[in-house]
Regions:
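Transmembrane alpha-helical segments of multi-pass membrane transport proteins and ion-pumping complexes
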Residues: 29, 59-63, 71, 107-118, ...
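Membrane-embedded translocation segments of transport machinery
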Residues: 2-12, 16, 178, 182-250
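Hydrophobic alpha-helical membrane-insertion segments
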Residues: 54-63, 101-124, 187-197
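Inter-helical loop and helix-membrane interface segments of multi-pass membrane transporters/permeases
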Residues: 6-10, 38-42, 72-101, 114-174, ...
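Transmembrane helix-boundary motif of multi-pass solute transporters/channels
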Residues: 14-54, 242-245
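Alpha-helical transmembrane segments and their helix-start/interface "positive-inside/aromatic belt" motifs
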Residues: 11, 17, 44-52, 93-112, ...
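Extracellular loop-to-transmembrane helix junctions
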Residues: 10, 40-66, 153-154
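Hydrophobic alpha-helical transmembrane segments of multi-pass membrane proteins
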Residues: 20-26, 52-57, 101-112, 160-167, ...
């Protein structure tokens, strides 16, 4: 890559903004939806023990490695893998072909997430207007969600989500992603802090906490506990995709 192509490249303006953006990249639907389900299914603390073990191991190796890879090449996955292969005296197109794999994977995730973001925006607006709670029973809520989740059932809010995302991306790293994360991530933290306080005073909370921190040796002998803990660690650290490598390149 030429010197001129890196001189005018956007970059992070603060360490704080970079850290918040990395957290925002990692803490996604895989943690908010899937993590509680797996903790409940695989024994609470029995699942958390291998999970935190994998987070430490992968964090000290994979995440740092991906970030260093992006920082060294100053490029996304296609260019980064192309440079890596070229440095070994081989055809860079081989590396570029490898780099397309995480790009295609991220595109598939983005398509699915755009639908979910549309749901979130619709429910957020409905919580302000009161329409979310307008249904009389569980069946009513189910029918309302089914209509929204049907093909073309939520086009407006899905389009709004895509437009907002596009505007943030057009504003660049420092003017878009970094700025929005400095606002959204603290709000996200206080939202979940308030939720944690609320749940602590609900009936049965003590039993739930005991379950979360209890470790059952027989559960640790189940290989699926370790398999899903490893998979969850990858989700939590946003590894093997584009995010960490691309953020490191800036």
């Amino acid at each position: 890559m030429s010197h001129s192509s890196t001189t005018h490249r956007d970059s992070w303006k603060s360490n704080w903004g970079f850290v918040l953006a990395c957290i925002g990249s990692a803490v996604g639907m895989g943690n908010i939806w899937m993590f509680p389900t797996r903790v409940s299914k695989y024994g609470g603390g029995t699942f958390l023990l291998p999970y935190f073990l994998f987070v430490i191991i992968i964090g000290l190796s994979g995440v740092i490695g991906e970030m260093a890879f992006g920082r060294a090449t100053r490029s996304g996955p296609i260019g980064a893998f192309g440079q890596a292969i070229a440095s070994r005296g081989k055809n860079p197109k081989i590396g570029q072909a490898i780099g397309y794999l995480p790009v295609i994977g991220s595109l598939a995730l983005a398509i699915g997430y755009s639908v979910i973001v549309g749901w979130i925006l619709k429910y957020a607006a409905g919580s302000l207007t009161g329409s979310v709670l307008a249904q009389a029973d569980i069946e009513g809520f189910g029918q309302a969600f089914g209509q929204m989740a049907a093909p073309f059932g939520n086009n407006f809010w899905q389009t709004v989500g895509i437009v907002i995302t596009f505007i943030i991306m057009v504003c660049g790293i420092s003017g878009g992603i970094e700025k929005i994360n400095k606002i959204i991530m603290p709000l996200f933290f206080f939202l979940f802090l308030g939720l944690a306080v609320y749940m602590a005073f609900q009936p049965g909370a003590a039993e739930g906490y005991r379950y979360i921190f209890r470790i059952e040796p027989e559960g640790l002998a189940d290989p699926m506990t370790w398999v899903f803990a490893l998979g969850q660690a990858f989700f939590s650290l946003s590894l093997a995709g584009n995010g960490t490598l691309i953020y490191g390149s800036y």
